[in-house]
Design a protein with these regions (language model features):
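A short, polar/charged loop-to-alpha-helix boundary motif
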Residues: 116-130, 254-271
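Residue-level detector of high-confidence beta-strand sites
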Residues: 100, 113-116, 249-251, 259
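Cys-nucleophile CN-hydrolase/nitrilase-fold catalytic domain and related Cys-dependent amidase chemistry
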Residues: 17, 26-106, 113, 179-210
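Short beta-strand scaffold segments in enzyme catalytic cores
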Residues: 86-88, 100-103, 139, 237-239, ...
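Active-site-proximal beta-strand elements of phosphoester/diester hydrolases
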Residues: 3-15, 20, 100, 113, ...
């Protein structure tokens, strides 16, 4: 049995980035002392979700990798002997920015990065204004706790991303996330969206025989422009097993610091029962490369 203790922080952020980092640091210390070996943080955890508006001043939030945040989280990873999945606004070059997940190894070094591939552009989620689509492809990151299939938020709606990670030996799928309710939606529509979001990811777990770890932010963040009523981030961070079973589900409206124990060897048993990778008809899937089959 290959046991892994996975910790995550579901946090409400404010405009005070120093306070956000302070609380993240305290949360990481607490999780590490409770035995976490892998700690996953939410998407763009250093700041408010600034993509509600298109504002060039928000580019000042970006930083290089390596940079201040990788140093901060790397020191914590080394001090406590944990692997950390962080999510940063990367300044790659003047005028070139990415939404980037960074994995810090137990020795504090960068094990690898993943640049978000699918970039949304919806009301209150104006990410195309800020982020260039990733160019590193879908490749698991090798760490001392396993091969991590790290993706980011909007990627979670695309089965292709999860499949490509699985086909390259990922032992789990990890999604740092920032998603919430659109202010004008009815309660019924809000519930449908939240359930669809979780269901599609649990489907990735089933289809690939892999656990899924998704960490979302929580709480209300106002729209700085005043054009909308802001976003109520719905939390619901969760861990699902390789059959899609819910192992843990967080609150929709509270911060949480949780450790979940996972048996990574269970994926092998599930894939023996459900050999989906064996039965794929790879000779018949060429049309998947087309935008649409007319």
């Amino acid at each position: 049995m290959k046991e892994l203790k996975i910790g995550f922080l579901q946090q409400h952020n404010t405009a005070d980035t120093k306070d956000n980092l302070l609380r993240l640091g305290e949360g990481i210390r607490d999780l590490a002392k409770r035995g976490a070996q892998l700690i996953v943080l939410q998407e763009l955890h250093n700041s408010l979700y600034f993509c509600q508006t298109e504002n060039v001043n928000n580019f000042d939030l970006a930083e290089p990798i390596p940079g201040p945040s990788t140093s901060f989280f790397g020191e914590l990873a080394q001090k406590f002997g944990v692997v950390i999945v962080a999510s940063l606004f990367e300044k790659r070059a003047p005028g070139l920015y990415h939404n980037t997940a960074v994995v810090l190894e137990k020795d504090g070094q960068i094990a690898g990065i993943y640049r978000k591939m699918h970039i949304p552009d919806d009301p209150a989620y104006y990410e195309k204004f800020y982020f260039t689509p990733g160019d590193l492809g879908f490749h698991p990151i090798e760490t001392s706790v396993g091969k991590l299939g790290v993706l980011v938020c909007w990627d979670q709606w695309y089965p292709e991303a999860a499949r490509l990670m699985a086909l390259q030996g990922a032992e789990m799928l990890i999604y740092p996330t920032a998603i919430g309710y659109e202010s004008s939606d009815t309660p019924e529509e809000q519930q449908r969206q939240r359930m669809a979001w979780q269901t599609v990811q649990r489907g990735h777990a089933v289809a690939n025989g892999l656990p899924v770890i998704t960490v979302n932010r929580v709480g209300y963040e106002p729209d700085p422009s005043g054009l909308t009523n802001g976003i109520q981030f719905w939390g619901t961070s969760f861990v699902a097993g390789p059959q899609g079973e819910l192992i843990y589900e967080a609150s929709t409206d509270e911060e949480e610091s949780i450790i979940v124990e996972m048996d990574l060897d269970h994926s092998e048993q599930v894939r023996r029962w459900w050999p989906f990778l064996r039965d794929r008809r790879i000779d018949k899937y060429t049309d998947i490369l087309k935008r649409y089959i007319d």
